[in-house]
Amino acid sequence: MKKICFLTLMLITAFGLNVNAQKLTYGAHVGVNFSGYQGGDGYHLYDEKVRTGYEIGGNIGYKLGYNFILLTGLNFSQSGGRFSTMSPYISETGSQTTEFKEVNTKVLSFEIPLKIGYEFNIGHNFSIIPNAGMFARYAIASIKSNVITADDRTQKWKCTDDFNDESHHIDAFKKFDYGFVGGVDMIFSGHYSLSADYKHGLKKIQPQFGMKSWSANISVGYRF
């Protein structure tokens, strides 16, 4: 995080940001997201699935000059994923067996993005803003998470806590996550927006299986 703060300070210094002198824009958005996990131990993980969730948030923009914009805000989202795992032990026949038929996660989180965008004015009432940067996210609650064991027992579980069932164990998912974000905003009539972005976590949010988060988001909004 120190590196992120340092890079942010460098960007602000480089563009000569003067909050009092620059035009401030703000707005709100609501949309849908598709999320899951990538990476991980290929010997233990299989059948990764995408989860559908939502995102609502407020947006703040500072016009830096030369069409560059510093974009931030605060988002509230529901995201998660689904996967299956193989047992770390070898069966009597010498083959691997399933340990968890399904591991389902779903969390509610607050997120702060920090991005730099460039506004292309295509016409009098239309502009496109490609943007890229980083995000920080913190999970405040685990909801509707559960585990289906190899013997078809479904057990409720808070994925931000450890799961233990006799000799079966799943480490807790980390509450804090951060990573890269890139996307594009389309502004219509100076106020209405249609946005899409992709987020990829840099932190191993589940150390036991070495997984990182990802999500794709589509939203509509209004810019004041």
Annotate the PLM regions:
Residues G36-R51, S79-S109, A139-K175, F209:
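Extracellular/periplasm-exposed beta-strand and loop segments of Gram-negative cell-envelope proteins
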Residues N20-G57:
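Short glycine/proline- and aromatic-enriched beta-strand/turn motifs that initiate or cap beta-hairpins
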Residues L24, V50-Y54, K106-I112, F126, ...:
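Residues that define the transmembrane beta-barrel architecture of outer-membrane proteins
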Residues Y62-Y66, F120-I122, F188-G190, F224:
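Outer-membrane beta-barrel strand-turn architecture
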Residues V32-G36, F76-G80, L108-E111, F120, ...:
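Transmembrane beta-strands of outer-membrane beta-barrel pores
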Residues A28-V30, T72-L74, L114, P130-A132, ...:
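Membrane-embedded beta-strand positions of outer-membrane beta-barrel proteins
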Residues T25, M186-I187, K212-F224:
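Outer-membrane beta-barrel "beta-signal"
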Residues L24, N67-L70, F126, G190-A196:
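Repeated loop/turn-to-beta-strand initiation elements of outer-membrane beta-barrel proteins
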